[in-house]
């Protein structure tokens, strides 16, 4: 299978920011309407792409933004849970995804189909595939079966590499040096300096999620810092 690396939808992301608009189950913002509003807001702020999960979220976001939409489905939290089946991938395309993000590892999938089957089905539906990888081996495997681009999304989460404090720049550089398709940096990009470091390491585009779209985590960072500072400055707190 041949990757479609010259596709205009993928080309629109080159050197640009992609924002992951996702909320965790049970959180106040876990609503397609809210995620669609977040997507609109970050596009107004300059995002050139949106990454979103869940069919209803994709359906809500698609009519409201005209940038590249990377779609996925999450099922569970162990093993292959990012767009784990061929049917899930096709549902993402039907919901409006330009690029479908899938697990790019060699692990068994719940429908028993190989990654190649998912990629072939997505290509037949005129969409592209982003393979979320945790190692160079994952990326090379995904590309061999037709992935159009690869991401560092799973770095530190498959057992192949330790979890890095920030973005896994070492893996990013390794992928850039050894693969023939665009490499998208994703995972633990916490500030603009991290994002720029990813571009400087050769990333085709950079995905930022929690640092932009997760107010609970952002607020906790501020609250914890203030609480820590207050304890240090309070003489009573040192006794």
Language model: regions and residue ranges:
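Short, surface-exposed connector motifs at secondary-structure boundaries
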Residues: 40-46, 100, 121-126, 177-181, ...
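Short, small-residue-enriched loops and turns at beta-alpha junctions
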Residues: 24-29, 76-82, 106-112, 136-141, ...
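General beta-strand structural signal in soluble alpha/beta enzymes
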Residues: 19, 50-53, 71, 101-102, ...
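C-terminal alpha-helical cap/extension of soluble enzyme domains
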Residues: 2-36, 79, 167-239
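Alpha-helix-loop-beta-strand connector modules within alpha/beta enzyme cores
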Residues: 14, 55-87, 94-95, 111-135, ...
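Glycine-rich phosphate-binding active-site loops on the catalytic face of alpha/beta enzymes
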Residues: 22-25, 44, 73, 95-109, ...
């Amino acid at each position: 299978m041949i990757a479609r690396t010259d596709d205009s939808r993928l080309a629109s992301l080159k050197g640009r920011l992609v924002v992951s608009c996702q909320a965790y189950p049970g959180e106040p913002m876990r609503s397609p309407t809210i995620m669609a509003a977040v997507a609109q807001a970050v596009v107004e702020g300059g995002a050139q792409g949106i990454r979103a999960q869940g069919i209803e979220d994709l359906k809500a976001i698609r009519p409201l933004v005209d940038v590249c939409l990377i779609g996925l489905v999450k099922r569970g939290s162990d093993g292959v849970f990012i767009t784990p089946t061929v049917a899930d991938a096709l549902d993402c395309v039907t919901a409006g995804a330009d690029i479908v993000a899938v697990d790019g590892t060699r692990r068994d999938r719940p429908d028993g189909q190989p990654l190649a089957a998912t990629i072939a089905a997505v290509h037949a539906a005129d969409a592209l595939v982003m393979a979320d990888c945790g190692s160079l081996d994952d990326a090379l495997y995904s590309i061999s079966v037709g992935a159009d681009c690869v991401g560092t999304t799973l770095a530190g989460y498959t057992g192949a590499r330790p979890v890095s404090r920030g973005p896994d720049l070492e893996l990013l550089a390794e992928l850039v040096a050894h693969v023939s398709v665009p490499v998208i940096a994703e995972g633990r990009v916490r500030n603009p300096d991290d994002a720029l470091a990813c571009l400087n390491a050769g990333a085709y585009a950079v995905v930022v999620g929690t640092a932009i779209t997760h107010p609970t985590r952002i607020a906790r960072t501020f609250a914890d810092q203030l609480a820590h500072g207050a304890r240090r400055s309070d003489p009573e707190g040192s006794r």
